[in-house]
């Protein structure tokens, strides 16, 4: 996954400077200089700075982390967790939408259906996957996959990472709102367990369309909201530069959403975010997903469906 060079966010400048100093000293050490002790001291300082920084992230900073280009994406989780993955394409009505990846495979030996939004990691793949913003055919593909999973009694895993559904004219003409609604309804009608994991951005109805699940898990520095901070800023203040203020007011972090009962569990990220150790993050996600499915296993179809429906009905009632 990801490119060879680490990309730093603006607020990570102190860590970037320390890492740069470490690289310089390692170059000197390679030429014969005995400075290993000094390198170790700076490495310890950099690790502490990183830990302190990420322990006090603001909602806006978490939004930046959630969007980090080197953060593991849907296809990385599929590659790391799903054996024998067989992707399926098309909605059988219009065409295929690669913003939404879906198919069947084995998760720790058990057959499973996987659907998720893929943003892409290079210019070519970002364009091909439309930056993770699905069109109507993407959500109709998700419905097709969920109906197949239900028919064959297979649990469904959703990997959520989207800024939102694609708002283009063509998408609207093909029934974007209806497709999102039907995908959300398909989640609710499943008689098999479904687990959703928000791995980056959970943007509005585009995320909810595949995240209406029995268990909703969320990474520590992911965000989940009805609208992006930039869009909220433009609407509320008529000023797109107030995104930071909007993010602070919107309660979009995993920590806030757990308090509100919108999500069920927060998954700890490696020090400095998932992008600094994708393999460890994917392993942690695998354990949490397995535990969630184990908790739901053996429950009857009617019970699974009723509990899921009640879970989402209770969110508004508990916040009222």
Swiss-Prot record:
What is the uppermost EC class here?
Answer: transferase
Know the name of this protein?
A: Acetyl-coenzyme A carboxylase carboxyl transferase subunit alpha
Q: Which residue numbers delimit the CoA carboxyltransferase C-terminal domain?
A: 41-295
Q: Which reaction does it catalyse?
A: N(6)-carboxybiotinyl-L-lysyl-[protein] + acetyl-CoA = N(6)-biotinyl-L-lysyl-[protein] + malonyl-CoA
InterPro entries on file:
Acetyl_CoA_COase_a_su, ClpP/crotonase-like_dom_sf, COA_CT_C
A cellular component term, taken from the record's GO annotations: acetyl-CoA carboxylase complex
Molecular function GO labels: acetyl-CoA carboxylase activity; ATP binding; carboxyl- or carbamoyltransferase activity
């Amino acid at each position: 996954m990801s490119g060879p060079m680490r990309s730093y966010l603006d607020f990570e400048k102190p860590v970037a400077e320390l890492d740069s100093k470490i690289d310089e000293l390692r170059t000197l050490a390679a030429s014969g200089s005995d400075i290993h002790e000094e390198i170790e001291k700076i490495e310890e300082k950099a690790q502490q700075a990183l830990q302190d920084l990420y322990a006090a992230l603001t909602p806006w900073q978490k939004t930046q982390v959630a969007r980090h280009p080197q953060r593991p994406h849907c296809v990385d989780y599929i590659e790391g967790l799903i054996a024998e993955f067989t992707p399926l394409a098309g909605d059988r009505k219009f065409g295929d939408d690669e913003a939404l990846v879906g198919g069947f495979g084995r998760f720790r030996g058990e057959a499973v259906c996987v659907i998720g939004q893929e943003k892409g990691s290079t210019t070519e793949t970002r364009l091909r996957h439309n930056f993770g913003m699905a069109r109507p055919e993407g959500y109709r593909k998700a419905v097709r996959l969920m109906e197949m999973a239900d028919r064959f009694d297979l649990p469904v895993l959703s990997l959520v990472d989207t800024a939102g559904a694609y708002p283009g004219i063509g998408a609207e003409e093909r029934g974007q709102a209806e497709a999102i609604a039907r995908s959300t309804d398909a989640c609710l009608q499943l008689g098999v367990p479904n687990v959703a994991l928000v791995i980056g951005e959970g943007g509005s109805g585009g995320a909810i369309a595949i995240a209406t699940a029995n268990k909703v898990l969320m990474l520590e520095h992911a965000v989940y909201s009805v609208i992006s901070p930039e869009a909220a800023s433009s609407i509320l203040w008529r000023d797109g530069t107030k995104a930071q203020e909007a993010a602070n007011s919107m309660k979009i972090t995993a920590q806030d959403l757990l308090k509100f009962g919108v999500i069920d569990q927060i998954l700890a990220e490696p020090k400095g975010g998932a992008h600094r150790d994708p393999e460890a993050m994917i392993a942690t996600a695998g354990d949490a997903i397995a535990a969630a499915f184990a908790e739901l296993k053996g429950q009857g179809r009617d019970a699974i469906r009723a509990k899921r429906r009640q879970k989402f009905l209770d969110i508004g009632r508990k916040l009222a």
